[in-house]
């Protein structure tokens, strides 16, 4: 950062006189492709689709923190997911199935690889580490995360 600040300061000292006397040359920016626009972010974008790759879901969790947050449903309740990681193994279970739930996190089968939930928040409760969540909410292998309250 210090090197960049020094280089920027030197370039600014060299360039400012040309800007002030009107002799600085302008360069048109290339228009090779149209300007990309991002879609408006909505709450429903945070719904985790466990049929997708676990790496994609982990990036979604990071990208939607703090708002609107990534979420799923378990037994008719919303579960927000605040921190997760990818386990480099292929699950045999159906996507959305809990593979393991212990102090290391909640392992969930995905379309490719396994997503491990480390920090979650059940609706009406505070944000907590997965092991604290599991002390009050019994998840077991075979339980399913859903894409609706059903």
PLM regions: where:
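Conserved anion/nucleotide-ligand pocket segment
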Residues: 1-24
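Charged, low-complexity, helix/coiled-coil-prone segments
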Residues: 1-7, 40, 75-83
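Generic alpha-helical structural context detector
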Residues: 2, 14-17, 39, 59-62, ...
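Hydrophobic alpha-helical segments and helix-packing faces
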Residues: 5-8, 30, 50
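Anionic-ligand binding region
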Residues: 26-41, 46-48, 61
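An anion-binding loop in the catalytic cleft
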Residues: 45, 50-150
């Amino acid at each position: 950062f210090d090197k960049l600040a020094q280089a920027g300061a030197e370039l600014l000292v060299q360039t400012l006189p040309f800007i002030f006397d009107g002799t600085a040359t302008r360069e048109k920016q290339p228009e090779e492709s149209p300007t990309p626009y991002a879609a408006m972010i909505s709450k429903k974008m945070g719904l985790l689709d466990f049929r997708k790759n676990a790496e994609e879901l982990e990036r979604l969790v990071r990208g939607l923190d703090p708002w609107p947050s990534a979420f799923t449903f378990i037994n008719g309740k919303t579960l927000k997911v605040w921190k997760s990681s990818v386990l480099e193994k292929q699950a045999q279970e159906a996507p959305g199935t809990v593979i393991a739930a212990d102090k290391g996190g909640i392992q969930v089968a995905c379309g490719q690889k396994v997503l491990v939930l480390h920090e979650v928040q059940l609706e009406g409760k505070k944000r907590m580490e997965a092991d604290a969540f599991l002390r009050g909410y019994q998840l077991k292998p075979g339980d399913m995360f859903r894409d609706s309250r059903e």
